[in-house]
């Protein structure tokens, strides 16, 4: 026999042994799962479901409880008679398939059986829980009934012992107590006839009603006190305040009808009492809040009129005097204006304003006469009179403020003239000082733009002297000339300083540069250009710039150094 054949035989034997081992292993695994299914089936079947159902049957349930119990009982009957038999059949089929080495079909059958028993276990657990709930509900009802009855009995006793605190609401409370008692009777009937679930619902409703009624009874005494004592007392006090208000000759605004408002308050009080008997506590509280708000509103109206009267009596007594005081001020102000206009031209229409104040005073005087007549007639609310009095006082205060402002303006004219005169004299002196300062520099001449600036500034100052010398001075014109002269003097001083500084520095730099003139042609040419600008063109700024650039060529920094020394030692000019 060849070696190839031997190898094939060995391989075949190995395959057969491996397949046999696999078959034995698969069969063992499936067999273990089948045994586990058998154990789960026995455990499920051994549960005391039937005994639990039989114990509930003895309770003789009715109504909703009976309906629920029948559903659970029917479900158990279906499981015990059909599902268990079907499960047995599936397990037996799996055993047959496994014994005949139909491994894959056996595994599928076992998987189906496992799913089926898992569903059955869930159903059985649901049945047991449902049945247990019926039993538990009956126990809870038995335990809870006494607690609920105690709540009810305590409530009834409290209401009976404190009937005087509830006023007319006692009848409605007794009706609600009777309804709750009926609910307890209904519970007893349902629970004793075997319907614990529906009985539990009725008991819960009765307990909720008891608790709610308890909460209501705790609030009612406070509302009763407010409705029957506090509010009537407040309304009585309000009526007394109203009577006193009228007796003291006060007049209410047209939009306030006192009788209607008092009747309205009484209506809301009666409405709150009616709502309380209906246990509409939120609406009762809203009505009482509304009453409180409207009572306070009436008191606020009274207080406003009292306050207005005090204001009217305080201010109206001095209105005539105040008007006369302002009128005298106006007359004096007109005289002052006439006097001032002899020396000054007024451009603010002061006289027109003062005459306008006089006309306004006549109008206000007529208003005051009417106000006083209305006060004496006692036919208009003081709040209205107070507004008119305040309006007159405010108008008089505005007139007086404007009178003071005009008077201060007139009084200040002489001071403004004096200040302008001093400024003109100072500027004139400074111009002469500037002229002398420039002359001391011994310059070959002055640039045209500088001369124009100097003479223009001098003309400004002379115009200021001219305006100040007029018979009637226009102070606005004077102030304008002071402003422009001040600006011109500032510009002239800066121009003078720049001119003289650059002229002096240009000369110093030219002298310093002469040391390089013979040895450096560029320096010689620069000096020549700088001298040309200095002596012929009188352009001292240009001459300074030219010689500075020239020096920078041969000795960088020399111009800056010399300029620094100059400015450090330079004395302050007299015109600054």
Curated annotation (Swiss-Prot):
It is found in: Cell membrane. One of its GO terms (biological process) is division septum assembly. Keywords: Cell cycle, Cell division, Cell membrane, Coiled coil, Membrane, Septation, Transmembrane, Transmembrane helix. Its main location: membrane. One of its GO terms (cellular component) is septin ring. The chain crosses the membrane at residues 8-26. Residues 1-7 are extracellular. Residues 27-576 are cytoplasmic. Residues 105-134, 254-305, 356-402 form a coiled coil. InterPro entries: EzrA (IPR010379). It is a single-pass membrane protein. Belongs to the EzrA family. Negative regulator of FtsZ ring formation; modulates the frequency and position of FtsZ ring formation. Inhibits FtsZ ring formation at polar sites. Interacts either with FtsZ or with one of its binding partners to promote depolymerization. HAMAP family: EzrA (MF_00728). This is Septation ring formation regulator EzrA. It comes from Lactococcus lactis subsp. cremoris (strain MG1363).
């Amino acid at each position: 026999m060849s070696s190839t054949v031997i190898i094939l035989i060995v391989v075949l034997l190995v395959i057969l042994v491996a397949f046999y081992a696999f078959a034995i292993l698969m069969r063992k695994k499936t067999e273990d799962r089948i045994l586990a299914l058998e154990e789960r089936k026995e455990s499920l079947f051994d549960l005391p479901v039937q005994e639990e159902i039989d114990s509930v049957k003895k309770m003789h349930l009715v109504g909703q409880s009976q309906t629920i119990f029948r559903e659970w009982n029917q479900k158990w009957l279906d499981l015990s008679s059909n599902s268990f038999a079907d499960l047995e059949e599936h397990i037996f089929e799996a055993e047959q398939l496994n014994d005949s080495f139909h491994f894959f079909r056996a595994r599928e059958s076992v998987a189906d059986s496992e799913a089926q028993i898992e569903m059955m276990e869930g159903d059985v657990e649901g049945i047991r829980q449902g049945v247990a709930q019926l039993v538990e509900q009956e126990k809870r009802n038995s335990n809870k009934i006494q607690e609920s009855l105690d709540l009810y009995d305590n409530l009834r006793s409290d209401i009976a012992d404190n009937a005087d605190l509830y006023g007319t609401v006692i009848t409605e409370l007794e009706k609600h107590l009777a309804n709750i008692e009926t609910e307890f009777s209904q519970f007893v009937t349902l629970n004793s006839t075997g319907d614990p679930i529906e009985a539990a619902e009725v008991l819960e409703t009765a307990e909720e009603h008891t608790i709610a009624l308890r909460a209501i009874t705790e609030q009612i005494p406070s509302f009763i006190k407010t409705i029957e004592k506090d509010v009537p007392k407040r309304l009585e006090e309000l009526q007394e305040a109203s009577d006193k208000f009228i007796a003291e000759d006060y007049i209410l605004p047209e939009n306030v009808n006192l009788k209607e408002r008092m009747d309205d308050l009484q209506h809301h009080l009666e409405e709150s009492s009616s709502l309380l008997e209906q246990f509409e506590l939120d609406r009762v509280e809203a009505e009482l809040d509304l009453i409180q708000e409207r009572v306070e509103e009436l008191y606020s109206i009274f207080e406003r009129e009292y306050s207005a009267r005090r204001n009217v009596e305080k201010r109206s007594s001095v209105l005539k005097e105040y008007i006369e005081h302002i009128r005298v001020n106006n007359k004096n102000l007109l005289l002052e204006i006439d006097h001032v206009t002899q020396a000054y031209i007024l451009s603010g229409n002061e006289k027109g304003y003062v005459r306008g104040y006089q006309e306004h005073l006549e109008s206000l005087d007529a208003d005051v006469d009417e106000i006083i007549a209305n006060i004496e007639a006692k036919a208009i609310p003081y709040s209205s009179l107070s507004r008119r009095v305040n309006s007159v006082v405010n108008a008089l205060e505005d007139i007086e403020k404007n009178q003071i402002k005009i008077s201060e303006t007139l009084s200040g004219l002489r001071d403004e003239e004096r200040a302008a005169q001093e400024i003109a004299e100072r500027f004139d002196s400074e111009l002469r000082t500037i002229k002398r300062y420039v002359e001391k520099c011994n310059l070959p001449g002055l640039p045209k733009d500088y001369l124009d600036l100097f003479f223009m500034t001098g003309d400004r100052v002379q115009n200021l002297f001219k305006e100040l010398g007029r018979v009637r001075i226009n102070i606005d014109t004077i102030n304008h000339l002071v402003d422009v002269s001040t600006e011109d003097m500032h510009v002239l001083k800066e121009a003078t300083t720049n001119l003289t500084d650059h002229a002096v520095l240009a000369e110093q730099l030219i002298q310093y540069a002469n040391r390089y003139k013979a040895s450096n042609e560029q320096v010689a040419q620069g000096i020549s250009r700088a001298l040309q600008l200095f002596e012929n063109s009188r352009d001292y700024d240009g001459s300074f710039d030219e010689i500075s650039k020239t020096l920078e060529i041969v000795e960088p920094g020399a111009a800056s150094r010399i300029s620094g020394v100059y400015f450090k030692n330079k004395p302050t000019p007299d015109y600054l």
